[in-house]
A protein has these predicted regions:
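Substrate-binding surface in catalytic domains of secreted glycosidases
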Residues: 89-112, 201-360
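Extracellular low-complexity, Gly/Ser/Thr-rich intrinsically disordered linkers
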Residues: 51, 366-441
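Conserved, mostly hydrophobic/aromatic
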Residues: 73, 143, 196, 226, ...
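An active-site-proximal structural segment forming one wall of the substrate-binding cleft
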Residues: 160-194, 222-230, 255-269
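Active-site groove signature of glycoside hydrolases
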Residues: 146, 175-213, 276
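Surface-exposed amphipathic alpha-helices with a cationic face
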Residues: 36-37, 126-142, 146, 219-237, ...
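Secretory targeting and sorting signals
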Residues: 1-30
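Glycan-recognition patch characteristic of GH18 chitinases/ENGases
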Residues: 35-181
Length: 441
C-alpha cells in the first residue's frame, strides 16, 4: 500500500474514532432505518453463557446501542443429540435450559425493565430476545446450531434422507414453532431462522467429533432439507425464514467438507471465519485475524481474511453472500524473548487472561494501550498487536475494524459478522465502528 493511502486511512480512522466516541446511544427507530438503508448484513453472536461470569445479559445489547446497529443476532448455541435431533438440555455440558428459557430475569437485567413473573411460560434469554425484537422490529434472531463444542453428532444427523428429515423437523419444532419441553408453543416467535455452525464436515474439530467422508455431500443435502422445510413453514407463517452457515477459513477444510457453489443455492448468506488463524498453541507469536498475510510471516502458505474470502470465491461463492467474521477478542502469548516489536518471536505459551489463557476480550485489551503495552500496526496487512516486552496480544481495534469494513465494501461482500458481542465495551465501540464503516458516507 502506498504511503499516501496510509495517511488517508489514518485520517479516516481518527475521524471515525471521534464520531464513535461522541455519539450517544441511538434511538431504536433511527438505528434501524440507518442499518437497513446500507443493505449490508450485520450479524452478532450472543453467547448463551455470557449471562454468567461475563455479566452480559440481552439488555446490554439495547443499552449499549448494539441492537440498533445489527440486522441479525445468532444465539450460540443449540445442541445436536447422538440420534440426530435438536435438543436443549442433555445434562452437564450438553445444554443449559436454565439460561435459555427457565431463569427468571430480574427487572434490572430485563430489556423492558419488567421482571419475569412467577409461573410465566417463557423466561431466560429467549424471553429477553423476544423483548429485544419488540423494541427493534427489523432485527432477526437465528438459533446457531453446533459450534466448536456441540458439533459432535452433526454427521449422524446429516447421514441419510430419513435422518436429515427428522433432524430438521426437530429443530423447526423446537426453535421456530417454540415447542419447548413442558411449554408447547411458549418460544414461538423468538427465532426467525437457522444458522448451521458445523465445525467441521469431514474435517477434524473438537476431539470426539463423528467424521465421515460423505459429510461433504451430506452437508449440501442437509442444507437442501432445511431450505425445503423452512419454506414449508414459511408458507404457514407468511414469512421467509433465513438459513445461514458458518464457514471455515482454511482452504483445505473448504475442499474436504463443502461443495462450493452448490451450498449457496440454499443459503441466504454465509459467515466466513476471519479469525483464529494463529494463537497460543503456536510456538511463535503471529497474527490471528489479519486482512492480508503480513510480510515476514514464518508460515507459507499462511492464513488471512483475504485468503479465506478469495478461497470461497474461487470455489464458486457469490461475493454478496459472503459475510466476513470479525473477532471481538484477541489471542496472546507470553514469555517472548526475541525483542523488537514482539511479532514472529518464540514464546513460552499462551498469555494469562480473564477466562481462558491466550484469549482476551477487546474491552480488556483496549485498557492495556498506554499501561505498559505499545500498540503496533501493519496497515498493509491490516492488523494490530500490543506488546510490553514479554507479552503480545494480536487483536482488532476500531482502526482495524474500520479497515475491514472498507475491504468488505470494495470486495463486494455481503456484510460483517462478529464473535462475540460480549467482547465489546459498554459503548459497543466495535459495533458502532462496523455501523459507520458499512453505512454510505
Amino acid at each position: 500500500m502506498r504511503p499516501f493511502r496510509h495517511r488517508r486511512l489514518t485520517a479516516v480512522v481518527t475521524l471515525a474514532a471521534l464520531l464513535i466516541t461522541a455519539a450517544p446511544p441511538a434511538a431504536a427507530s433511527a438505528g434501524d432505518d440507518k442499518q437497513h438503508r446500507s443493505g449490508y448484513h450485520r450479524v452478532g453472536y450472543f453467547t448463551q453463557w455470557g449471562i454468567y461470569g461475563r455479566a452480559f445479559p440481552v439488555k446490554k445489547l439495547d443499552t449499549s446501542g448494539a441492537a440498533s446497529r445489527l440486522t441479525h443476532i445468532n444465539y450460540a448455541f443449540g445442541n445436536v443429540s447422538e440420534d440426530g435431533r435438536c435438543y436443549v438440555d442433555g445434562g452437564p455440558g450438553e445444554g443449559d435450559a436454565w439460561a435459555d428459557y427457565q431463569r427468571p430475569v430480574p427487572a434490572e437485567e430485563s430489556v423492558d425493565g419488567v421482571a419475569d413473573a412467577p409461573g410465566q411460560a417463557l423466561n431466560g434469554n429467549f424471553n429477553q430476545l423476544a423483548k429485544l425484537k419488540a423494541k427493534h422490529p427489523k432485527l432477526q434472531v437465528l438459533i446457531s446450531l453446533g459450534g466448536w463444542s456441540w458439533s459432535t453428532y452433526f454427521s449422524n444427523a446429516a447421514r441419510t434422507d430419513a435422518s436429515r428429515k427428522a433432524f430438521v423437523a426437530s429443530c423447526i419444532d423446537l426453535y421456530l414453532k417454540g415447542n419447548l419441553p413442558g411449554s408447547p408453543g411458549a418460544g414461538a416467535g423468538v427465532f426467525d431462522g437457522i444458522d448451521l455452525d458445523w465445525e467441521w464436515p469431514n474435517w477434524d474439530g473438537e476431539p470426539g467429533n463423528v467424521i465421515r467422508p460423505e459429510d461433504r455431500e451430506n452437508f449440501t443435502k442437509l442444507l437442501a432439507e432445511f431450505r425445503r422445510q423452512l419454506d414449508a413453514h414459511g408458507r404457514k407463517t407468511r414469512t421467509h425464514h433465513p438459513l445461514t452457515a458458518f464457514l471455515p477459513a482454511n482452504p483445505a477444510t473448504m475442499d474436504a467438507g463443502y461443495e462450493g457453489r452448490k451450498i449457496f443455492t440454499y443459503l441466504d448468506f454465509a459467515t466466513v471465519q476471519g479469525y483464529d488463524f494463529h494463537g497460543g498453541w503456536d510456538a511463535k507469536t503471529n497474527q490471528q485475524s489479519a486482512l492480508r498475510v503480513p510480510t515476514g510471516s514464518p508460515d507459507n502458505p499462511d492464513f488471512s481474511v483475504e485468503v479465506a474470502v478469495d478461497g470461497w470465491i474461487a470455489r464458486g461463492a457469490p461475493r454478496g453472500k459472503l459475510v466476513l467474521g470479525i473477532p471481538y477478542y484477541g489471542r496472546g502469548w507470553t514469555g517472548i524473548t526475541g525483542g523488537g516489536n514482539g511479532l514472529f518471536q518464540p514464546a513460552t505459551g499462551p498469555a494469562p487472561a480473564t477466562f481462558e489463557a491466550g484469549n482476551e476480550d477487546y474491552k480488556k485489551l483496549k485498557t492495556l494501550a498506554g499501561n505498559g503495552f505499545t500498540v503496533h500496526r501493519d496497515l498493509r496487512a491490516g492488523h494490530a498487536w500490543l506488546f510490553d516486552g514479554t507479552t503480545l496480544w494480536t487483536y482488532d481495534d476500531p482502526a482495524v475494524v474500520l479497515q475491514k469494513t472498507l475491504y468488505i465494501r470494495r470486495a463486494g461482500l455481503g456484510g460483517a459478522m462478529v464473535w462475540s458481542l460480549d467482547g465489546d465495551d459498554d459503548n459497543a465501540t466495535l459495533t458502532r465502528t462496523i455501523d459507520l464503516g458499512l453505512t454510505t458516507w
